[in-house]
């Protein structure tokens, strides 16, 4: 990593240098209601305090779970409560959707794991925290299970973990 001293006594990082990574890993198995508005996806939220000015943030989400009637369900990422890198058209626009792993509706024993990421350009200020969170919405109210399938009465049904990884990259 190339570092140079600047007049203010701070450090100037070369563009593209990874400055830090923060992670949330959750094993909590819980259901939630998905509505037509963005709702936080399980416990996938994290604040990061920038080490650099005007940094970029690579935000990666790995979600494990199952959604009742998963069609029309959209996953997105918010920064300080606002969706990032997606058309502002609202409901129906998505960075990702649940991955169908079965050829028919199966709201019982088939997880729909999803991975998605985006690189967010910011006007970050050193020391001023930014909060990222994974969010979910749908065209109608439905139930979503985090880190498990709907059914968990035997070891035949899958369980997993979910993760939010945020990497700050010097801008």
Residue ranges and their predicted role:
Residues 2, 40-43, 94:
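Acidic/proline-rich low-complexity IDRs
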Residues 4, 45, 49, 131:
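Ser/Thr-centric signal marking residues that sit
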Residues 1-31:
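Glycine-rich, low-complexity segments
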